[in-house]
Amino acid sequence: MDTNRYKSTFGFVDLLFNLLVGFTFLFMLAFILINPVAKKEAHDPKAEYLVIMSWDDNSKSDIDLWIKDDKDNIVGFRSKDLALLTLDRDDLGDRNDMYTTKENVELVPVNREVISIRSKTPRRYVVTTHFYNNLGDPDATPQNIKIELLQVNPYRILKIVEVVLVEPSQEKHVFDFQVLTGGEVIFHESDQLIINDVALESIPYMDR
């Protein structure tokens, strides 16, 4: 038996296998370089401050959170994303707290609205809350509202305010604060309103 011939054959097969592995690796490397992974959240800077409003989870009333800066940029349900201010969701009481499964419709009672401020640029802000309507439960008044101002990084609770809204169309001032150079926040005494000062109808609807 010519054992050298078999050794030569096995060596040739090993060489072909190694070449195949090498070409496969080079192909995968070239594919990765041609299609680089997109930078995460390159289009959406992280939040620096959060304004969080919550009210009775079982309430059917529609309460709205509004913010206005010193450049007259107004963010609320009509204009949800403007000047690095973003309202995450227009909570309508229990009317949009539902989701559908294969079996039925589930209700998750959470009444909460959050506005993100995605910049530490020096600006001054006014925050208000507005009783839009109580169509879901005409007798459900008054409404106890809690509003928090949080700094995200480093995490700090800057202010917590509780107000009571008694009837639809009522608006209450929550706080007036200013972001200074470097990110420090100071508060001002004020009773400025947004909706009742500007007129809700004058704020145009803007798609996100």
Please name every model-derived segment.
Residues 1-11:
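N-terminal Lys/Arg-rich, disordered targeting/topogenic segments
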Residues 9, 13, 191-192:
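A subset of signal/propeptide-processing and intrinsically disordered low-complexity segments
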Residues 10, 18, 37-38:
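N-terminal alpha-helical membrane-insertion module
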Residues 12, 16, 62:
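Calcium-binding loop positions in Ca2+-binding modules
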Residues 16-20, 24:
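Sec-dependent signal peptide hydrophobic core
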Residues 24-208:
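Intrinsic-disorder/low-complexity signal
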